[in-house]
């Protein structure tokens, strides 16, 4: 009996102590959990988090002794800064500018608004040598530098360069000089001091520099003088993939980037594509005018497109077309196009000049996508499917009555009666189209 009583007492004491210890442990764990929860809440404070980082990518567009579009690109940065000032700063946003000062020297800048002086400071972050940014691995490294210095919920990319659409630099003869040689005299390459006859020449660059009002400058991606500084769209897409990022939008301030082949190539690395299907004038995008539409956690694509085209409509160089493409819809468009291509081909009786051209090449490289599909005369069912999907794909598209080209001699404009927002090179007889289009993802998905 006595022995049993002692055992029970010991048990009750042990039980009471265990309850105390367990209760103490519970309180400690609860406090620890509350501490971590508190820290986590601070880390995801949606009011203070950086919602958008825009990378402005302005690489080299000239040669070893010519500066290309450098002066225009510097003006574009000034225009962005003016837009930031008008908006009274950057609210939950960052803007980093990659600017190439010389063909082999570049700097990554942080645009920082000074509220006291109402100015924008360009704070250097990192210097780069060479042109590794023109490779997929190099561009991915640049994007990683951007993320490390300005991490955000969303990333966007503005590219200001010369451009030649989906085409591959390696498919050009003297890229992209073999444009439209005609009788007369033109500049050789980008050197205005070297004049050559184009009676039999295949070396007309079509890229004009200078302040002659009768010969406006256009932004004919990368450099057209240095092949090592040219970037294929597939390289750009691969670089973005390697970085692990996906862009909210990519804006091409460059010629001829608004084609369905380019949109298809970029569909997995961006939600939207803002681009022109024709040549973009040297002044480029009026960033100050449309900055509030671009620098936003929810960009206003329709207003951005309208702002760009209206700027040129009211200028003394009224030549512009621009569109905002929802790249998330491109796969569905390709699926319908594949069915159309399986049943219809362009009849030999359809003259190519009856399909709206959007370029100055000879033969033409880029044709309006909608007019091309109309020219295939698909059945009502397929045509309706295509039209409905095209409306979902092209969020906004506007154009002036004419487009300008520096690829003809003499230089001039041509009528644009139809512009859906995307071009296509399927019907082109240009040698570069014949060489390259079957290599594109779009062709493989639709044929």
Where are each of the predicted segments found?
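Bacterial Sec-dependent N-terminal signal peptides
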Residues: 2, 6, 19, 29-56
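Bacterial N-terminal signal peptides that target proteins for export
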Residues: 14-26, 276
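N-terminal extension/subdomain marker
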Residues: 40-153
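Structural recognition of the beta-strand scaffold that forms the well-ordered cores
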Residues: 53-58, 94-99, 156-159, 248-252, ...
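Solvent-exposed loop/turn segments at secondary-structure junctions
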Residues: 60-64, 101-105, 131, 161-167, ...
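Surface-exposed loop and adjacent secondary-structure segments within mature catalytic domains
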Residues: 100-124, 154, 158-223
């Amino acid at each position: 009996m006595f022995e049993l009583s002692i055992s029970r007492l010991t048990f009750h004491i042990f039980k009471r102590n265990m309850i105390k210890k367990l209760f103490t442990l519970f309180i400690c764990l609860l406090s620890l959990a509350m501490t971590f929860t508190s820290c986590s809440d601070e880390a995801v404070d949606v009011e203070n988090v950086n919602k958008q980082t825009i990378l402005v990518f302005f690489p080299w567009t000239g040669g070893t002794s010519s500066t290309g579009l450098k002066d225009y690109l510097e003006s574009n940065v000034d225009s962005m800064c003016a837009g930031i000032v008008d908006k009274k700063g950057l609210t939950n946003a960052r803007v980093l500018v990659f600017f190439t000062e010389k063909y082999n020297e570049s700097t990554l800048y942080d645009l920082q608004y000074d509220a006291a002086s109402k100015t924008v400071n360009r704070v250097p972050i990192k210097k780069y040598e060479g042109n590794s940014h023109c490779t997929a691995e190099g561009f991915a490294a640049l994007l990683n530098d951007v993320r490390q210095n300005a991490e955000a919920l969303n990333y966007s990319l503005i590219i200001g360069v010369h451009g030649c659409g989906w085409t591959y630099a390696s498919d050009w003869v003297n890229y992209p000089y073999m444009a439209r040689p005609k009788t007369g005299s033109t500049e050789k390459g980008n050197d205005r001091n070297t004049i050559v006859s184009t009676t039999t020449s295949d070396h007309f660059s079509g890229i004009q520099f200078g302040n002659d009002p009768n010969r406006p400058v256009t932004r004919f991606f990368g450099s057209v003088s240095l092949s090592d500084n040219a970037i294929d769209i597939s390289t750009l897409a691969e670089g973005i993939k390697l970085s692990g990022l996906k862009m909210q939008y990519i804006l091409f301030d460059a010629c001829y980037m608004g084609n369905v082949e380019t949109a298809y190539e970029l569909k997995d690395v961006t939600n939207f594509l803002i681009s022109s299907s024709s040549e973009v004038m040297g002044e480029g995008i009026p960033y100050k005018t449309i900055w509030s539409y671009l620098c936003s956690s929810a960009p206003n694509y329709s207003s951005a497109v309208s702002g760009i085209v209206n700027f040129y409509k009211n200028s003394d160089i009224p030549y512009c077309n621009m569109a905002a493409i929802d790249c998330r819809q491109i796969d569905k468009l390709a699926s319908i196009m594949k069915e159309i291509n399986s049943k219809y081909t362009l009849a030999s009786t359809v003259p190519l000049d009856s399909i709206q051209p959007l370029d100055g090449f000879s033969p033409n490289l880029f044709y309006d996508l909608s007019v091309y599909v109309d020219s295939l005369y698909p059945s009502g069912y397929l045509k309706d499917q295509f039209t409905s999907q095209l409306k979902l794909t092209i969020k906004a598209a506007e154009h002036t009555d004419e487009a300008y080209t520096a690829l003809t001699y003499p230089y001039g404009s041509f009528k644009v009666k139809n512009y859906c927002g995307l071009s296509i090179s399927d019907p082109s007889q240009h040698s570069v189209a014949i060489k390259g289009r079957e290599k594109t993802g779009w062709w493989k998905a639709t044929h």
